[in-house]
């Protein structure tokens, strides 16, 4: 260490080069101010008005709609990002910028793109799992970028943890010798991501990677009045981080300003010997006049600076000027490897400023922004297309093996290149879903709230998907012209499936059906109407979560449960919750005489996913999905068929192994996406034709696995997976994911080209789909109604 505790002032001559450059830049910018500063950035259109200093016309405003908070940036009352408004006045002034903006509009764009650019350089250890961010609230784009990146590039992203310490306003608790931390007023990130905000430093854990971004906003382009305060704060954050960093593999990404080399020499000196690798990184996308730079410190040695120096610094924070408290021996700073690398980066920054001032080149910013997106693997708004294929999808799964039920490791999947490609498709799908995180949506709405959707000021995701629902006009006519009951999208989808696969219900005068996860009853109604059109009777039974026990059970919206209480089965006397993730419930159904000789079964399992769990829908549904499958195998008669709903991306080992099993014990297994199913959602229907049966011992093993908490979405429960099945499976699921991505792209396209959406409505495109649906699906007027 070159720091000694003395009272001498430090020689500031080392900053002369920086000060001289700043003086020249100030003189240049005095001719045009803000506009001249912004025009210097080739990537300005990436994040319009991304100011690193305070400006009276720049503001962040929170808007709340549908119980959702939106963080919206404005300059001079012009909406900057995210673009969420119908209001043409807001959009007109930046309309030319919109196509070149990123498709994903971050909550915190201020730092999102800088860190994204850093992450694309692949410095971060790919095995890092636990991350800590320490910094200002407006710099949370750093951790936002990290979460998106890990979802896109790491297969085990669900195991990652993200912790946030909002800097500023920490208060010391003398009783616990810790610091109390403030939470953000509006927790935007927690709406969409699983992230933990600390309230006390006692909650700190051990982390693989720590990001520190605690530099204050400047007062002007080069006016850093809080330099001394920022140095004190960053010393504290740095020392605290070293105590909570994993030894040997731990890393820190630390942002500071080159405005004052002097302040950061103390940090260079303290860090010398603490890490094996040092690298400076200055993102291309930031403004040339912005002095920020990142220092990446990798492979923590475990060495922490001497306690006497550390204690002297910490006990004098904010009390004395650091340069007065310590003497920095500048005669030896030249041998510090961090300082040597810093000089290279600092001189490059200075040279770039001088070159720009001297040349003032004309730049095609749009071209640079597009190149930046291409290089850093981010999509732009202009990359979306208005793909309008609403045709149904039907794929038959091949399997010539007979796997046995056995729990094995799923690691063999991770070594398969085809499976790796499928995981990449899952990552792409999740990214497209993420695009709507910062846009208003009714998924945040508490349904008990009264809300007038007709007067919404913002473009909502629901408005786009609702307008692109080409089958919505079918519902009214099914009710009015055909006396249809409980007409919902679910009704239309099952009716379409029954017509597409007429052989899944046997041709007999009376058919007995059993409907799983059925409330409020649309599948019963659709099957009843379909059977009536064939001149047959339906003897139906249904199950769902018992509303007496489960507040999450669906309401008896249409009154079918109260009208037919004997038709709704919830289990046994000992357990009548209706929870099909319990083998006890399924066994009670299998032994129930009312359910003997079942001809047809449906499963419509689903679960409410919180907005921050939408990319984990398949994982959350894993055991419920298994429950409805086991129930079908336990209750369905041999030779009969079933249909159940599941969700893409179908990459979880448990789902793959279950479908592997099903394809071997049914004559046919078909993936089907009805035309009436919203193309942008993840639901897929599995059609199971002609059940071959399963042995009692195999069924008992499935019961045990269903009840075993160790069997999760990552479990693989068959002993073999043949090439024929796997090749067929990968191809089918890949095609379905591609279709969903195309539909999501279409929705995003119309989000930004809403005028074309109005044109679709004017052109009455709905009539084409209306005619096609009724031509394909025979419907008759229902006289024998369920509610007679």
UniProtKB/Swiss-Prot annotation:
This is Uncharacterized protein L511. Residues 485-693 form the Adrift-type SAM-dependent 2'-O-MTase domain. GO terms for biological process: 7-methylguanosine mRNA capping; methylation. Its EC number is 2.1.1.-. The active site is at residue 645. Keywords: Methyltransferase, S-adenosyl-L-methionine, Transferase. S-adenosyl-L-methionine binds at residues 521, 604. Pfam families: FtsJ. PANTHER family: CAP-SPECIFIC MRNA (NUCLEOSIDE-2'-O-)-METHYLTRANSFERASE 1-RELATED, CAP-SPECIFIC MRNA (NUCLEOSIDE-2'-O-)-METHYLTRANSFERASE 2. GO terms for molecular function: mRNA (nucleoside-2'-O-)-methyltransferase activity.
């Amino acid at each position: 260490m070159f720091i000694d505790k003395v009272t001498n002032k430090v020689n500031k001559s080392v900053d002369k080069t920086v000060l001289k450059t700043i003086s020249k830049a100030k003189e240049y910018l005095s001719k045009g101010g803000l506009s001249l500063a912004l025009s210097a950035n080739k990537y300005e259109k990436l994040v319009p008005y991304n100011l690193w200093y305070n400006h009276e016309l720049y503001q962040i405003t929170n808007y709340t709609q549908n119980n959702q908070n939106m963080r919206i940036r404005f300059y001079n009352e012009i909406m900057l990002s995210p673009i969420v408004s119908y209001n043409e006045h807001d959009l007109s002034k930046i309309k030319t910028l919109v196509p070149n903006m990123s498709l994903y509009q971050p909550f915190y764009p201020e730092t999102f793109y800088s860190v994204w650019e850093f992450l694309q350089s692949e410095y971060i250890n790919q095995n890092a799992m636990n991350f800590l961010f320490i910094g200002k609230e407006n710099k949370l784009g750093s951790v936002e970028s990290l979460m998106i990146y890990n979802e896109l590039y790491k297969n085990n992203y669900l195991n990652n943890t993200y912790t946030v310490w909002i800097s500023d306003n920490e208060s010391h608790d003398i009783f616990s010798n810790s610091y109390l931390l403030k939470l953000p007023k509006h927790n935007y990130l927690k709406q969409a991501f699983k992230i933990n905000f600390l309230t006390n430093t006692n909650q700190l854990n051990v982390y693989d990677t720590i990001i520190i971004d605690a530099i204050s906003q400047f007062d002007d382009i080069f006016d850093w009045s809080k330099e001394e305060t920022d140095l004190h704060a960053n010393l504290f954050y740095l020392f605290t981080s070293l105590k909570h960093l994993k030894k040997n593999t731990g890393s820190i990404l630390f942002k500071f300003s080159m405005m004052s080399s002097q302040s950061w020499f103390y940090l260079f000196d303290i860090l010398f010997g603490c890490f094996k690798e040092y690298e400076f990184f200055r993102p291309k996308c930031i403004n040339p006049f912005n002095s920020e730079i990142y220092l990446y410190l990798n492979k923590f040695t475990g060495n922490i600076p001497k306690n006497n120096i550390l204690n002297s610094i910490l006990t004098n924070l904010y009390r004395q000027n650091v340069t007065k408290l310590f003497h920095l021996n500048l005669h030896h700073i030249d041998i510090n490897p961090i300082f040597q690398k810093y000089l290279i980066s600092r001189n490059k920054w200075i040279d770039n400023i001088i070159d720009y001032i001297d040349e003032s080149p004309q730049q095609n910013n749009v071209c640079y922004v597009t190149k930046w997106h291409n290089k850093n693997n981010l999509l732009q708004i202009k990359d979306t297309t208005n793909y309008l294929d609403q045709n149904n999808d039907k794929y038959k799964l091949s399997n010539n093996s007979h796997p046995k039920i056995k729990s094995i490791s799923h690691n063999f999947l991770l070594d398969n290149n085809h499976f790796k490609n499928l995981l990449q498709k899952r990552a792409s799908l999740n990214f497209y879903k993420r695009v709507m995180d910062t846009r208003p949506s009714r998924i945040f709405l508490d349904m008990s709230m009264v809300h007038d959707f007709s007067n919404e000021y913002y473009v909502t995701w629901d408005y786009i998907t609702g307008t692109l629902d080409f089958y919505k006009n079918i519902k009214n006519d099914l009710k009015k012209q055909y006396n249809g009951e409980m007409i919902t999208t679910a009704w239309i989808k099952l009716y379409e499936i029954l017509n597409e696969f007429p052989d899944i219900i046997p041709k007999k005068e009376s058919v007995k059906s059993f409907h799983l996860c059925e409330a409020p009853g649309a599948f019963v109604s659709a099957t009843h109407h379909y059977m009536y059109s064939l001149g047959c009777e339906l003897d139906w039974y249904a199950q769902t979560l018992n509303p007496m026990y489960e507040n999450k059970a669906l309401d008896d919206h249409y009154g079918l449960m109260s009208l037919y209480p004997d038709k709704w089965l919830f289990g046994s006397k000992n357990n009548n919750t209706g929870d099909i993730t319990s083998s006890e419930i399924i066994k009670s159904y299998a032994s129930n005489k009312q359910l003997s000789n079942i001809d047809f079964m449906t499963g419509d399992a689903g679960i409410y996913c919180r907005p921050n769990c939408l990319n984990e829908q398949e994982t959350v549904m894993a055991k419920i999905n298994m429950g409805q499958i086991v129930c079908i195998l336990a209750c369905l008669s041999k030779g009969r068929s079933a249909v159940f709903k599941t969700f893409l991306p179908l990459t979880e080992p448990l789902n793959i192994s279950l479908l592997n099993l099903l394809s071997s014990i049914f004559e046919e297994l078909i993936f089907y996406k009805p035309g009436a199913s919203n193309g942008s959602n993840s639901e897929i229907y599995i059609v199971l034709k002609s059940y071959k049966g399963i042995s009692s011992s195999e069924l008992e093993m499935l019961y045990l696995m269903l009840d075993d908490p160790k069997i999760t979405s990552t479990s693989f429960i068959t002993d073999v997976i043949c090439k024929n099945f796997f090749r067929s499976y990968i191809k089918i699921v890949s095609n379905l994911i591609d279709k969903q991505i195309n539909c999501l792209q279409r929705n995003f396209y119309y989000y930004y080209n809403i005028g074309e959406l109005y044109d679709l409505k004017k052109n009455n495109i709905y009539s084409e789909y209306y005619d096609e649906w009724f031509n394909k699906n025979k419907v008759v007027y229902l006289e024998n109604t369920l509610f007679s």
